[in-house]
Regions:
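Extracytoplasmic/secreted proteins, especially bacterial periplasmic and envelope-associated proteins
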Residues: 218, 222, 257, 317-320
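Structural helix-adjacent loops and short alpha-helical linkers that scaffold large soluble proteins
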Residues: 214-216, 255-258, 325-328
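Beta-strand/loop-rich accessory regions of lumenal/periplasmic or secreted enzymes
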Residues: 1-242, 278-279, 285-297, 313
């Protein structure tokens, strides 16, 4: 019932095994430009002192072994170093994400570990048991999304990929008015108005498992790149035209002044349209991939609040134009 039920969050939970010492448990999150790498227990101690080479060794992705030359110093200090349990990276807008971490203790707060603009949508947890990464395609584009790693202190941890993050406002499926405006704003039918029944949204998650060792930043960034921009089979315009699977249409021709002018105008129009999603922030779980229908020359913005003139929703002319542009 759209009047009483609101979507606070929807996600997928994956559990994984942790084993070994806390200082050999690693957490990585893909940010704007690289990996945010942390440790459940970072071996940085003021008193008693642990040699810096031990801390450096951790961040180089190496396990600290029991026969390490600094193990006595580690064991002397380990009881006074925080054991971090939970890491969250949350993209609640298309322009900002936040990373927070906590010890998951009752009555204790989480702390901010950093900010960025557009996260890449991958998290990784690794220990002596191996590692796991979870990636969300179009992570920042389909905000509000988040990835949580919890239970790093435990034998069993979990990663939750939130397609709609519970840290955001609940999703309200009600119409903006209690009456229809079919004639005035070209939307739906007055008898039915706007109804959320039948709404669907496809989301892609990728899980990768690693046998041993701590996976390098470069490897994880390559995984993220592959998930965000997977390889696709694309034919040439000539092939699409030849097989006629999409009916009759013309290839690009510039053999007359008129055809040259038409092609130039089409190029200018598509170039403008392709830049609009980023300029206008046409992002969000239910908006990404869609485009606006009609521009308001007086407000100097798209008619976002005028029903059928707002989101295009694969209807009529823009869809045909964009598909034909792709094929040509």
């Amino acid at each position: 019932d759209k009047n009483t039920q609101f979507m606070k969050g929807i996600g997928v939970e994956v559990r994984f095994v942790n084993s070994g010492e806390g200082y050999n448990r690693h957490i990585k999150l893909a940010g704007d430009y690289g990996m945010f790498h942390e440790l459940m227990v970072g071996l940085k101690s003021f008193k008693p002192k642990i040699p810096d080479r031990c801390y450096k060794n951790q961040y180089e992705g190496n396990f600290i072994e029991n026969d390490d030359e600094d193990i006595k110093a580690v064991k002397a200090a380990i009881g006074n170093i925080p054991y971090w349990d939970t890491y969250k990276i949350s993209q609640l807008s298309p322009l900002s994400y936040e990373i927070r971490k906590s010890m998951a203790k009752k009555g204790c707060c989480s702390i901010c570990a950093g900010f960025g603009k557009r996260a890449q949508g991958l998290v990784y947890a690794g220990s002596r048991a191996g590692g796991i990464s979870v990636s969300m395609r179009d992570f920042w584009q389909k905000f509000p999304s988040s990835l949580w790693i919890e239970g790093m202190r435990n034998d069993i941890g979990k990663i939750t990929a939130w397609i709609w993050s519970p840290e955001s406002n609940g999703c309200d499926f009600r119409h903006y008015d209690d009456e229809g405006h079919a004639n005035g704003t070209y939307e739906g039918f007055n008898e039915v108005k706007s109804d959320p029944v039948g709404i669907a949204n496809t989301n892609e998650l990728s899980i990768e498992l690693y046998e041993s060792g701590i996976v390098s930043d470069d490897t994880l960034l390559e995984v993220s790149k592959r998930v965000q921009k997977p390889a696709l089979f694309v034919a040439t315009p000539e092939y699409y035209h030849e097989v006629k699977a999409f009916g009759e249409w013309s290839l690009v021709r510039r053999d007359t002044p008129l055809r040259t002018w038409l092609e130039d105008e089409l190029d200018r129009a598509i170039d403008f349209y392709l830049k609009e999603p980023d300029k206008q922030n046409w992002y969000g779980l239910f908006n990404y991939g869609d485009v606006m229908h009609t521009y308001d020359a007086y407000r100097h913005m798209w008619q976002y609040d005028m029903g059928g003139r707002a989101w295009q929703n694969t209807e009529l002319v823009p869809t045909y134009w964009l598909w034909y542009t792709f094929m040509r």
